[in-house]
A protein has these predicted regions:
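Residues that define the transmembrane beta-barrel architecture of outer-membrane proteins
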Residues: 50-52, 68-72, 99-103, 132-136, ...
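Repeated loop/turn-to-beta-strand initiation elements of outer-membrane beta-barrel proteins
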Residues: 81-87, 113-119, 146-152, 175-180, ...
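Outer-membrane beta-barrel architecture
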Residues: 73-77, 104-108, 139-141, 167-169, ...
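Outer-membrane beta-barrel initiation region
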Residues: 24-97, 109-110
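Residue-level signature of outer-membrane beta-barrel architecture
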Residues: 78-80, 109-111, 142, 154-156, ...
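Detector for outer-membrane/organellar transmembrane beta-barrel domains
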Residues: 133-194
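Transmembrane beta-barrel strands of outer-membrane/channel proteins
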Residues: 58-60, 87-91, 121-125, 152-156, ...
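Outer-membrane beta-barrel "beta-signal"
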Residues: 209-214, 244-258
């Protein structure tokens, strides 16, 4: 019995490998597709698309009875997530005279390790009814703690003149559509520019409180109250030219996003 089992195992060891090789030799080869060149691969994520954005934070009429004016403050950009071209513009029109005309074109890029802030660099031109001035600009823009919109900017021009602007606002959602927005803007100058009515130090403040209703995600009318005033040497220039040094005004306008 044992010799018979040993003979069967011996025959299996001799014959089975040859049989397996014969079966493999007769099996047809599986065709292999030629790999797609890496240059033809699609991008795994569409993370380099060009987008556009435009917003008007102020597009409003201002009045206190004797004095009525129109003010705009808007900005927009075009670019990718990492590289953008910003355009900003603001100004005030009173009795057909434009003042505070400030227009900027800036290159924008995220600040490493600062999730909600970008640095911006470019040029600013003061273009209104007064003398034209040109500046180089450098600043940051983004969301500070508790999502407070914060935008400090530093300017320099010929003659070593330096200026700074600090502005910000906060959107407090009372409901899903009702928004209360406090806002402030301050301007500083290192040297006086009498032709433009600007003195040294703190030049002016514009601040207000607006209440808007967001009918859609692109449109929200609002009403509010603002104070705009000049200080120090700028206030002296205002008095000498017969202009008020401070105004309290009611406002009505629209916020726009696109």
């Amino acid at each position: 019995m044992r010799s018979r089992l040993a003979l069967q195992l011996l025959l299996a060891g001799v014959l089975l490998p040859g049989f397996a090789m014969q079966v493999c030799a007769q099996a047809p080869e599986t065709p292999v597709d030629v790999p797609t060149p890496a240059s033809d691969w699609p991008k795994p994520v569409k993370d380099n698309r060009v987008f556009t954005f435009v917003t008007f934070d102020q597009f409003e009429g201002r009045t206190n009875g004797p004095t009525t004016s129109f003010r705009w403050d808007g900005q927009g950009w075009i670019g990718t997530d990492f590289n953008k071209l910003w355009i900003k513009s603001e100004g005030t029109v009173t009795n057909g005279v434009t003042s505070d005309g400030d227009h900027e074109i800036l290159y924008d890029r995220p600040i490493p390790h600062m999730r909600y802030f970008d640095w911006q660099a470019g040029a600013r031109v003061d273009l209104d009814s007064g003398p034209t001035r040109a500046w180089l600009a450098l600043g940051v823009q983004g969301l500070a703690r508790y999502f407070f919109n914060f935008e400090p900017t530093f300017y320099v021009r010929d003659g070593g003149r330096v200026a700074g602007r600090l502005q910000g606002y906060y959107d407090l959602y009372l409901t899903q559509r009702l928004i209360l927005q406090p806002q402030v803007e301050m301007n500083f100058y290192s040297q006086a520019d009498r032709a433009r009515g600007i003195g040294t130090g703190l030049s002016d403040i514009d601040g207000g409180l607006r209440l808007g209703y967001q009918f859609s995600r692109k449109f929200a009318p609002y009403v509010g109250y603002v104070y705009s005033g000049t200080f120090g040497q700028t206030a002296t220039f205002s008095r000498q030219s017969g202009q008020p040094t401070g105004l309290n005004q009611f406002v009505f306008g629209i916020w726009l996003w696109h």
